[in-house]
Every structure is written in C-alpha cells, then in structure tokens.
C-alpha cells in the first residue's frame, strides 16, 4: 500500500538562501535565531531553556540546518541517532509567498512574477476599490494600506463595527486581504465580498495570488482576535501538481488538512478537513492517516508557526509551538508503516527575530521518514520541486517538469 504524508511547518526556514540578497533577507534564519534565543534564556515566556526538539533532531533537522548555514543550531542534540533522510532545499520560485512555496513542493514552481500592491498607503487602485464598493453595495472601506493583520484590527476594528466598512489591506506578498467582524458584518457576507474581489482582480489582470478572508471577533482594541474561519481564494497552479496527477493518473485520494485545499485552489483535492491550531491539526491528521487507503496523500499545513508566531515576531511562542509539534511527532511516526513515507518540510521562512513582519527567503528542511527509507544526508536540493518529483516517482506518476527524486 502506497501512502505519502506531507507535513508543512509553515515558515520553518533553516537559514537564508543563496538569493536572499534579492529580498533583503541575508542572514535570516528562523530555526537558528529561535534556538539562539532559547539557549540564551531570552525565550523563556511560557517555556524555558534550550530549544528541545529530540524527535525532529532524530529525523536530521539539526544536521540539515548545519548544512544550510554552516552552524549547528544552539541547544539541539548534535549526537542524536539519525533515523531519517534529511536535506535542505532552496526555492527557485520568484517569490517567498505561501502559494509559490507549496506549488513548488508539489512540483510546479512559480517562475513568473506575481503582481503586488507596493504602495504602503493608498495601496489599491481607485478603479478597483470603486468596483468593489458598487458590486458589493458597501458603505465604503477602511485601511487601503500595508499592515500586519493584528495591528490593523487594533487600529480600525471598532470603526469597522460602527460603520460596516470592511478593512482592506495588503503586505509584501501578492495578497488582497479583507478583515471583517464575524458577528456585526457576517461571515457569509465576508466570503461573498472576497469572491467579488477575486473576480475583479482576475478580470482586471492584476495577477494577484490570493484574496484572503480574515474574519475576527472581539469588541475593543486588545481583545480583537482572528478566528479559524479564514478562507483563501487563490488562482489555480499553472500546471498539474502531484496532487492532480495522483487523482487523474491513479484514481488516488488527496486529503487536505488545514488550508492546503485553498492554497491549491481546490485543484487535485478529493477531501477537505478543517482544523485550527497545532493540536487540532495533529488530531485531524492522525485520524486521516488511520483511514488512508492505497494511493493516498494526506497533506497538512501547520499555519500557526507562520501566522501566530512568525509574522508576529514572537520568538518564545514559535519555540513553544515547535516543542509541542515535536512532542506529538511520535504519534504520527508510529502510523508510518510498510511502504509509507512521511515528509516534513516548509514553504518559506518567517524569522521571528527579523525586522518587519514579512516572510524571509530561506532554505527549508526536507526530512523523510519511513520503514524503507535509507537514513542519512541527501545533501542540498536545488529546488523544493525535488519533493514533488520524489512523490511522483514513488507513486509511479508521469515525471514532473522540475526537480530530481531525492530517494
């Protein structure tokens, strides 16, 4: 029975890539800087001491990071018995965003340039805004700027609740984000607005990767919080991914846990499972692994590393989340039997010690585990697409256009 379990630790980079200068990210190192802070005792909020990741270490995380940066992460076990295949991979996609990283993992790198809203203030074209107001019958809008999602809620959420005007904002990514209160504005109404925005952006040829619904609750600054009802409206990948090929060529199953389905615009997904938070995502993944049949991919995105800790530049929070993931990892590994393959990786970096709030251009770990996987170093992978090619070869799919099989 052939089954692949892909776990994306969203934003878990292991050192700046060779082209990081193009992004202003030379020296960024998500894992390395978290480990440094823990070892120095400056990440003791809600946890304490050196970063403790014994299970990831046995899969080769520390050695992959050392190969990427030249430095072994502070506090991790240098003498761990390696039980998995490990490598570090660089991205060839033009951006450092979520769709680019995920599509490349699935064998389809983004070699075109996304469109971006580059102006910090008055970020969106007036023509686009006027169309949204007219089509969605809005009383107006707030924001129209670059911002962190949590900061803008403290600034504008009260006014939004009073006026019914949605909050429009963007970032360094190719995104149009809309924040609205779940109760005063309504979740369905927010989703409808996002559908309209997606249509206008596509028809207007803006080449924007995602429209993101950002629902929130709360009643005053300091207690506004985003809910788990986020919804991403992405464009479709420009070529068939390993997900679509498994379904089309083998009649296989692809189970999305978390936001995977949204990232691939639902293409190549046969089942969607919603879950919010690391524990809930883990529980949902284990349940799907228990029922997975032949020719199945279970694909989970652990978004909290990125959204709750990376973008918010929360080093102790990121460290605690990694330690939680590591504690639960044996539950997952014990379900990897026979011909099964488990792949742990990331889609980009988001160094919580870095300036600003955006992603960082980094290499990512590629950790592969299975009863028939030969442990050891598999070197530097020149593209995330090596993961996709590995999966294609494993299932006997037609080869992908990019990448070389790792195993």
Curated annotation (Swiss-Prot):
InterPro entries, per the entry: Alkaline_phosphatase_core_sf (IPR017850), DeoB (IPR010045), Metalloenzyme (IPR006124), Phosphopentomutase_DeoB_cap_sf (IPR024052)
Pfam families (alphabetical): Metalloenzyme
BP-aspect Gene Ontology terms: 2-deoxyribose 1-phosphate catabolic process; 5-phosphoribose 1-diphosphate biosynthetic process; metabolic compound salvage; nucleotide metabolic process
Swiss-Prot/TrEMBL catalytic activity: 2-deoxy-alpha-D-ribose 1-phosphate = 2-deoxy-D-ribose 5-phosphate; alpha-D-ribose 1-phosphate = D-ribose 5-phosphate
One example GO MF annotation: phosphopentomutase activity
Major localisation: cytoplasm
Source organism, top-level taxon: Bacteria
Binding residue positions for Mn(2+) 1: 10, 347-348
Transmembrane segments: none
Protein name stated in the entry: Phosphopentomutase
Organism this protein belongs to: Pectobacterium atrosepticum (strain SCRI 1043 / ATCC BAA-672) (Erwinia carotovora subsp. atroseptica)
């Amino acid at each position: 029975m052939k089954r692949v379990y892909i776990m994306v630790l969203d934003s878990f980079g292991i050192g700046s890539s060779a082209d990081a200068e193009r992004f202003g990210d030379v020296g960024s190192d998500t894992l390395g800087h978290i480990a440094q802070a823990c070892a120095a005792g400056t990440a003791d909020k809600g946890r304490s001491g050196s970063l403790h990741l014994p299970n990831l270490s046995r899969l080769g995380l520390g050695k992959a990071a050392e190969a990427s940066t030249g430095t072994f992460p502070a506090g991790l076990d240098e003498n761990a018995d390696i039980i998995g295949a490990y490598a570090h991979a660089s991205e060839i996609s033009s951006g450092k965003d979520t769709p680019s990283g995920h599509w490349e993992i699935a064998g389809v790198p983004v070699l075109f340039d996304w469109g971006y809203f580059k102006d910090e203030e008055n970020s969106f074209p007036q023509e686009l805004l006027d169309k949204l107001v007219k089509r969605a019958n809005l009383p107006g809008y707030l924001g129209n700027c670059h911002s962190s999602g949590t900061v803008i809620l403290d600034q504008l959420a009260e006014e939004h609740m009073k006026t019914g005007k949605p909050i429009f904002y963007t970032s360094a990514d190719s995104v149009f984000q809309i924040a609205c209160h779940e109760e005063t504005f309504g979740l369905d109404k927010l989703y409808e607005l996002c559908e309209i925005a997606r249509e206008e952006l596509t028809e207007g040829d803006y080449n924007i990767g995602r429209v993101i619904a950002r629902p929130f609750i709360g009643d005053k600054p300091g207690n506004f919080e985003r809910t788990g009802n986020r919804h991403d409206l992405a464009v479709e990948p420009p070529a068939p991914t390993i997900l679509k090929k498994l379904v089309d060529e083998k009649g296989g199953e692809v189970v999305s846990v978390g936001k995977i389905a949204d990232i691939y615009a639902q293409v190549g997904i046969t089942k969607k499972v919603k879950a919010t938070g690391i524990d809930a995502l883990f529980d949902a993944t284990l349940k799907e692994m228990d029922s997975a049949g032949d020719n199945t991919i279970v694909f989970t995105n652990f978004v909290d590393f990125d959204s709750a800790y990376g973008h918010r530049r929360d080093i102790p929070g990121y460290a605690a989340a990694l330690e939680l993931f590591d504690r639960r990892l044996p539950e997952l590994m014990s379900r990897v039997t026979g011909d099964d393959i488990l792949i742990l990786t990331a889609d980009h970096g988001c160094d919580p010690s870095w300036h600003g709030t955006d992603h960082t251009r980094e290499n990512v770990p590629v950790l592969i585990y299975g009863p028939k996987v030969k442990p050891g170093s598999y070197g530097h992978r020149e593209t995330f697409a090596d993961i996709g090619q590995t999966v294609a070869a494993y299932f006997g799919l037609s080869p992908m256009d990019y990448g070389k099989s790792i195993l």
